[in-house]
């Protein structure tokens, strides 16, 4: 039954003219982003959030490699990796990959055109005896990200000091490949995004005020077309994603809280929420909500062979089953 459900979803994904053509890109690229409901358009310095905002990696000051592998509901294999590295003091480059594979989908011939009951019976017996042939669905995306950090000073008038704003911008160039049964499809998409990071402690002269960030991204600029070998075209529509985050150090205990919000405008308008608690920069507790339901997760950071390692876990209970996801990130310098 699950195979039938998955195949139905695949048909929507491969042959829809609108919002399903890029659904595999929205599974998630890290346990951190998945755990907070993927409300990461305004989350800075998280390279794996590139699909929602390519500008965020400009605020990362180190090279990193991350990898996520998932057996989705015991039916599909999904992976994601990300490599990012600074190119000087203000520019960061990233290369990322995503892949979804659903294998051994049984091909069931259409026998509705056989009206004779005996002929239909014989056909079914022959098919069962010989076995059904199968095919696979593969969807991959390769993305290049380039992000640059800009700084501006703002004089609010009532302050003795000017306010320093961090304003990175970024762009994604993505190559998409699809393979379903005997069909192949390809397309190229472009995203552009930006962040504005505001230190509220400088705005209000209150030392414990947090860091407020606004983010916005236009994905699939002017639409991304998937060209199929059948000469059919699918269109991934342009979407505008906007959101905000607020990072606050708690006074009494050594905990930092991140509150995240994101909304998407386009053919599938939606809202996403997330929260992350960071305990002593070592333990991460995460929760979030999106159209798939409620998510939860944890993360741990430690040193191994003089490299900083992040291990993450996220969990989702879905109608198709429970999804457990694990990933790791290695900071290379």
Positions of the model-derived regions?
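Sec-dependent N-terminal signal peptides
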Residues: 3-13
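Subset of outer-membrane beta-barrel
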Residues: 17-333
């Amino acid at each position: 039954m699950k195979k039938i459900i998955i195949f139905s979803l695949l048909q929507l994904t491969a042959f829809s003219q609108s919002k399903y053509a890029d659904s595999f890109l929205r599974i998630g690229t890290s346990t951190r982003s998945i755990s907070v409901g993927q409300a990461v358009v305004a989350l800075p310095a998280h390279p794996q959030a590139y699909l929602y905002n390519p500008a965020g990696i400009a605020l990362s000051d180190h090279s990193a490699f991350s990898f996520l592998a998932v057996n989705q509901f015991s039916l599909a294999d999904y992976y994601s990796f990300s490599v990012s590295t600074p190119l000087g003091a203000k520019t960061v480059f990233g290369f990322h990959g995503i892949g979804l594979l659903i294998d051994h989908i049984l091909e069931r011939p259409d026998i509705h055109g056989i009206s004779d009951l005996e002929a239909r019976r014989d056909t079914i017996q022959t098919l069962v005896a010989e076995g059904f042939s199968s095919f696979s669905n593969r969807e991959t995306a390769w993305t290049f990200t380039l992000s640059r950090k800009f700084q501006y000073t703002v004089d609010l008038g009532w302050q003795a000091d000017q306010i320093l704003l961090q304003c990175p911008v970024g762009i994604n160039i993505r190559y998409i490949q699809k393979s379903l049964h005997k069909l192949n499809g390809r397309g190229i998409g472009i995203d552009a995004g930006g962040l504005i990071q505001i230190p509220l402690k400088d705005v209000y002269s209150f030392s414990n005020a947090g860091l407020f960030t606004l983010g916005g991204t236009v994905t699939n600029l002017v639409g991304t077309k998937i060209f199929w070998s059948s000469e059919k075209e699918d269109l991934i529509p342009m979407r505008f994603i906007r959101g905000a985050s607020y990072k606050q150090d708690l006074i009494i205990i050594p905990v930092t809280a991140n509150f995240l919000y994101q909304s998407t405008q386009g053919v599938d308008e939606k809202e996403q929420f997330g929260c992350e608690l960071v305990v002593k920069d070592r333990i991460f507790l995460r929760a979030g909500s999106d159209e798939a339901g409620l998510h939860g997760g944890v993360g741990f950071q430690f040193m191994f062979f003089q490299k900083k390692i992040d291990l993450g876990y996220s969990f989702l209970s879905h109608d198709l089953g429970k999804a457990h996801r694990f990933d790791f990130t290695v900071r290379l310098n």
